[in-house]
UniProtKB/Swiss-Prot annotation:
The keyword Hydrolase applies. The gene is pxpA. It holds the Pfam family LamB_YcsF. GO terms for biological process: carbohydrate metabolic process. PANTHER family: 5-OXOPROLINASE SUBUNIT A, UNCHARACTERIZED PROTEIN YBGL-RELATED. This is 5-oxoprolinase subunit A.
Amino acid sequence: MKTIDLNCDFGESFGVYRLGKEEILPYITSVNIACGFHAGDPLVMRQTVQLAIRHGVAIGAHPGFPDLLGFGRRMMAVSPEEVYAYVVYQIGALAAFVKAEGGVMTHVKPHGALYNMAAKDARISEAIAKAVYDVDPTLILYGLAGSELIRAGQAQGLQTASEVFADRTYQADGSLTPRSDPQAIIADEDEAVKQVLMMVCDRHVRSVQGTAVAIEADTVCLHGDNEQAVRFAKRLHAALQNEGIAIQAMRKETRR
């Protein structure tokens, strides 16, 4: 039976600012929790870990650039050494809360501009993979399907999860269409569901240029920061089940 993980970025509130809907949790299997750099704060991190444990979803760290004002979506001129330190720091912060609450951390998924940079920059992706491995070699590294980050994780000896997006369009080279492009976002829910089923079942996606691009899908990213998020998650969950696809979190491989 085919399986797929449904993941969602979570815990991206901080201070008095609130973002994300708890109602989406019954329809996903993994959460990527902000670690205080692009969003989140210590109290939100702890509360989000508690929420994830209560709902039985897999817990992952979501490290990003230190950029609250830009929500971690702005590119920064950083060295691999800086990226390594950023990632170790943020994984460590979340890991402490997970341990304190009696949970288990399963994965790491970079956020925003760091994620996009790692998709194409081999040195940045290698720094991220090494940081994850050095903290805990059993953690699963999430990255854009077919990206440098997936290759770096595999080369480092990490288990990886190739991620695809429900509401983002793709270029002919398999990269995501930049958010600055009017065609970047799929607003039509029917089209988004159709795209996910194509990627999961047929292992390809239709690019904005009209070409079929081969793609590996281990996990699907759902965005939980808009009004339609819960409705769409529920609908996609049902559509996948109707196709006989099991929805479950990534499982750590047994390593010898």
